[in-house]
Amino acid sequence: MTEVSSLTGRLLVATPALADPNFDRAVVLLLDHDEEGSLGVVLNRPTPVDVGDILEGWADLAGEPGVVFQGGPVSLDSALGVAVIPGGGAVDGAPLGWRRVHGAIGLVDLEAPPELLASALGSLRIFAGYAGWGPGQLEDELVEGAWYVVESEPGDVSSPAPERLWREVLRRQRSELAMVATYPDDPSLN
């Protein structure tokens, strides 16, 4: 098997051609990617459920909108916390209960007391479920043209307007991808 170049910390942006309704115009932050598979969370699928309804202690730390996001179609009954540490979270200064994924972005131990992290977190999102791919599956989807792979920015995790994130991420690209942001929601109405 060939070695897999890690895409951990990067974004998968669904191409307009991706037909899976779970990922229509999705922006996925890859939390882990190696030869054993990939795991990520969809950053732009807010649910109507308030964070306080399922994780009361974390509600005050959740960014706006303060709702749970559907992280993907796998394990919808599990919760993941993704947070940004202001200043990039220096290696020796990473707070207890937070594990770096990429740069200032990391996973939060939701079993830890929220007050342990309250002063350290810049923004927090809670996700129900995740997106997962088996060995080689994501690579196959990339070859098929289902996803664009782009760099993430810490603000992507806590976008106050998640419904605009797909277009915003594409617009900031310095390539022909910026033009894809203008693609109509329903091309048949064009």
Model regions and ranges:
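A short aromatic-anchored loop/beta-hairpin motif
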Residues: 1-190
